[in-house]
């Protein structure tokens, strides 16, 4: 694995000197926060004249018009022609494309993928769970997480073979999930008071996990996890919070803005500890 520049200096700095190739780099956040724009900007930043970008688009966010507009704005007109977009309407289609078709097409067309993007990894996963009766949710979730793991493993192997950057997006867990976690902590604490065996040690200590949808296996596999959040600085200014990284300290933040160029640095391009980043927002609000 090597590291490559994302084309956004402040993001390179956040990740400790660039984004890892041959490994899963995960971005998650609330709907509409800019995850697709971030992936698009990084992918186009990685793509040179000889390379290509392969995208598995499950949410119809990678439109030809949008791609062409970003390429024009960043001074790379026509580079959108190097982006190969696959679209899936079901989990079964997503599985087939991720685990088989992309690899076959790369080999048969002699593409040189600089980036592989799965945006998002969890749209069909979430939709499938919503349609499952409550009594079968646990078993259905395990089944879907298993399929998702196979897909991610296939793409990691592919990215490793071509020394490509692999990015995937996920969604933020709902408030219902947070309430369930709070209830679990209370139950575990009660078990401890009654001197019963405590199996969930993390729950007993109130440990905070990753707030993303898709199961813990995705979090385990990822070499970097960025949570993207809206801020009160401006509607187009977002915070990128580094929650996991093998190359850099976590709980650090950079601010970026969304415009016609996709994602660019906001203000002074500087990596901040979480406490300082929060202070910046509070200072702007006064």
Name what the model sees in each region:
Residues 50-140:
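Conserved inter-motif catalytic segment of the P-loop NTP-binding fold
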Residues 1-79, 283-285:
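The Walker A/P-loop phosphate-binding site
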Residues 25-27, 54-56, 84-86, 167, ...:
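Hydrophobic/aromatic beta-strand patches that form the interior of the parallel beta-sheet core
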Residues 115-120, 124-137, 141-169, 176:
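Aromatic-anchored, glycine/proline-accented short structural segments
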Residues 17-19, 45-49, 75-78, 104-111, ...:
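Conserved catalytic network of the ASCE P-loop NTPase/AAA+ motor domain
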Residues 5-8, 12, 21, 64, ...:
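Amphipathic alpha-helical transducer elements in NTP-driven molecular machines
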Residues 11, 27, 67, 83, ...:
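Conserved RecA-like P-loop NTPase ATPase core
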Residues 146, 153, 157-280:
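Phosphate-binding/switch region of NTP-binding enzymes
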